[in-house]
Amino acid sequence: MSGKGAKGLIMGKPSGSDKDKDKKKPITRSSRAGLQFPVGRVHRLLKTRSTAHGRVGATAAVYTAAILEYLTAEVLELAGNASKDLKVKRISPRHLQLAIRGDEELDTLIKGTIAGGGVIPHIHKSLINKSAKE
């Protein structure tokens, strides 16, 4: 008998069950950065879609997730205000459209069409003056 099994007990080495107690709970990069958006997923998507052959810095994912979270919060806040003005509890694509087109900076940033958003009401100034004279 070589005595290999007894050495661990005598030397006080942790057995398999003790190793689980010593492990720390993993902390996500999102919680480390104080974000709600998933930094790991953003990093993976940046790596797969970049032209740098998968080389993306760790902080690039954090910055990108922070920017996405900020823009989402901004749009949702404005859309929530629009839905509250219309006395509705649910945000619809129409409310998103009104919020984005109502803000000048968001309007220049998001130039795409929002499905189900409708159109923004607009009456030309010359038509308003013509009807006011009569």
Curated annotation (Swiss-Prot):
Pfam families in UniProt: Histone, Histone_H2A_C
Return the Basic and acidic residues bias intervals.
16-25
Q: What does UniProt give as GO cellular component?
A: nucleosome; nucleus; plant-type vacuole
| GO MF, one example | structural constituent of chromatin
S-S bonds: none
Q: Does the keyword Cytoplasm apply?
A: no
Example GO BP:
regulation of gene expression
Q: Please give the residue ranges the record annotates as the region Disordered.
A: 1-33
Keywords in alphabetical order, please: Chromosome, DNA-binding, Nucleosome core, Nucleus
From the Swiss-Prot or TrEMBL record, state where the protein is found: Nucleus; Chromosome
Q: Which residues form a coiled coil?
A: none
**What's the chief localization of this chain?**
nucleus
In terms of PROSITE patterns, this protein maps to: HISTONE_H2A (PS00046)
CDD domains documented for this protein: HFD_H2A (cd00074)
Q: Respond yes or no to whether keyword DNA-binding is given for this record.
A: yes
Family assignment from sequence similarity: Belongs to the histone H2A family.
Subunit structure of this entry? The nucleosome is a histone octamer containing two molecules each of H2A, H2B, H3 and H4 assembled in one H3-H4 heterotetramer and two H2A-H2B heterodimers. The octamer wraps approximately 147 bp of DNA.
Q: Briefly state the protein's biological role.
A: Variant histones H2A are synthesized throughout the cell cycle and are very different from classical S-phase regulated H2A. May replace conventional H2A in a subset of nucleosomes. Nucleosomes wrap and compact DNA into chromatin, limiting DNA accessibility to the cellular machineries which require DNA as a template. Histones thereby play a central role in transcription regulation, DNA repair, DNA replication and chromosomal stability. DNA accessibility is regulated via a complex set of post-translational modifications of histones, also called histone code, and nucleosome remodeling.
> Mind telling me what this protein is named?
Probable histone H2A variant 3
In its UniProt entry, the species of origin is given as Arabidopsis thaliana
